């Protein structure tokens, strides 16, 4: 089944709930970057959170949301992009990180990411300069960190759940997440009731493994609160890189540097950090780029 994000609005329009099955998306990221278990879990959670934030906070097809996470853990930096049309991409600085399981027998994402560092979210909506909100990491588990970001940077009371189940061979069994947001008009009693539902909710990975859909996960979170489901949004890993794009960047290099690539290397090759695609430039390609300086 293809990945998608389900969304719903409470009947009184006091809450929004989003839930995603991102299994295929995270599998594609793992395949492209050859990530090991701890790196897979961290990158997968970041991708799911980015998809949920983009679905809730972007309005136009050209809008872009970028998440940067830099903790003091061994996976290093995490960088992810999301769009309003359900595409995400991203990479982890150190893809080959395995760690012992934590005290509850799960992948130790908090140790992998680190508990000291920053989480930054940049929104580019095509009007004025992009806006960046930044908060310190509070746990490194990422779900709590994104919850804190929404509360402190966007002033939105929220609850976020993120989960990636990695098999022993480093493949991804399931991945997904949810995001509950309070809207203007919500009162503390309503929020407490839904937060209680969230606290008793099993891990999203367990719900997905048991066969629940994103819509059913939303219903579990809503409990007795009636909700109106909105249009579902397909979700996939996709990158907008191209040989032409990287060529445009290379064309800005000094003439002498391009000539050195021709004389010493007989061409050039570049790799996209976000997706791992490689692009080769022949001598003829480089000579064509050099003509842009003339």
Curated annotation (Swiss-Prot):
Post-translation changes: Under oxidizing conditions two disulfide bonds are formed involving the reactive cysteines. Under reducing conditions zinc is bound to the reactive cysteines and the protein is inactive.
GO biological process terms on file: protein refolding
Signal sequence extent: none
Record's keyword terms, sorted: Chaperone, Cytoplasm, Disulfide bond, Redox-active center, Zinc
Main location: cytoplasm
Disulfide bonds: 239-241, 272-275
Compartment annotation: Cytoplasm
CDD domains recorded: Hsp33 (cd00498)
Its biological purpose: Redox regulated molecular chaperone. Protects both thermally unfolding and oxidatively damaged proteins from irreversible aggregation. Plays an important role in the bacterial defense system toward oxidative stress.
HAMAP family, A to Z: HslO (MF_00117)
Name the UniProt record assigns to this protein: 33 kDa chaperonin
Gene source species: Lacticaseibacillus paracasei (strain ATCC 334 / BCRC 17002 / CCUG 31169 / CIP 107868 / KCTC 3260 / NRRL B-441) (Lactobacillus paracasei)
């Amino acid at each position: 089944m293809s990945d998608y994000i389900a969304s719903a609005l409470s009947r009184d329009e006091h809450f929004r709930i989003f839930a995603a099955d991102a299994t295929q998306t995270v599998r594609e990221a793992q395949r492209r970057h050859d990530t090991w278990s701890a790196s897979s879990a961290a990158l997968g959670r970041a991708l799911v959170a980015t998809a949920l934030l983009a679905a809730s906070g972007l309005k136009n097809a050209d809008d872009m949301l970028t998440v940067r996470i830099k903790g003091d853990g061994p996976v290093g930096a995490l960088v992810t992009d999301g769009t309003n049309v359900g595409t995400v991409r991203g990479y982890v600085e150190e893809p080959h990180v395995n760690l012992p399981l934590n005290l509850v027998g799960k992948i130790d994402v908090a140790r992998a990411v680190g508990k000291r560092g920053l989480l930054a979210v940049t929104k580019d909506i095509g009007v004025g300069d992009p806006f960046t909100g930044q908060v310190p990491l509070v746990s490194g588990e990422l779900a709590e960190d994104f919850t804190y970001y929404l509360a402190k940077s966007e002033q939105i009371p929220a609850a976020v759940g993120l989960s990636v189940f990695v098999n022993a061979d480093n493949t991804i069994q399931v991945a997904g997440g949810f995001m509950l947001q309070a809207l203007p008009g919500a009162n503390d009693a309503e929020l407490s009731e839904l937060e209680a539902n969230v606290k008793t909710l099993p891990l999203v990975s367990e719900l997905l493994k048991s066969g629940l859909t994103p819509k059913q996960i939303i219903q579990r979170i809503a409990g007795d609160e009636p909700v109106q489901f909105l249009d579902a949004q397909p979700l996939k890993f996709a990158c907008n890189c191209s040989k032409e794009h990287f060529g445009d960047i290379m064309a800005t290099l000094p003439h002498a540097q391009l000539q050195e690539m021709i004389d010493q290397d007989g061409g050039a090759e570049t790799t996209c950090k976000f997706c791992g695609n490689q692009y080769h430039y022949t001598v003829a390609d480089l000579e064509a780029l050099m003509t842009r300086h003339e």
